[in-house]
Amino acid sequence: MNLRTLSAMAVITGASVMGATPGLTQTVPASQVRAINLARNTAVAENGGLTVYRPQPCMFQTSSGGGDCLVNQDNNGYTFQFLGGAPGWPENGSSPTTETEIQIAPDGRTVNEVIYNGSPR
């Protein structure tokens, strides 16, 4: 049996030619993904919608759980702090117009508190 035969058998049986390769694992808990999505969507709604407001790019980094925007995670939940502004503000170099700090419950399903939503501090 040669490599070509083994490869053909793997394709026929549906087995991976590479063998047991490590798969992608989610290191960010589902509650944290829910939390970043809820925090981002709450800020968008509070600031007039996507036609006039876009949050800082870190609020779209669900695979890293919010990256630099996640400032605290404890028994009270997830706290995010991030800037926002007119659509395209980070890409075109214009200044942000809004800063939002928001705490989401530990399960990621409810807003505990909008701590701050106003001009950048």
Residue positions per predicted region:
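N-terminal signal peptide c-region/cleavage motif recognized by signal peptidases
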Residues: 20-22
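Bacterial N-terminal signal peptides
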Residues: 9-18
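A short, surface-exposed interaction/processing loop segment used at functional sites
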Residues: 95-121
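Exposed beta-strand-loop-beta-strand "reactive/processing" segments of non-cytosolic proteins
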Residues: 55-104
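Short, non-transmembrane alpha-helical segments in secretory-pathway proteins
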Residues: 26-62
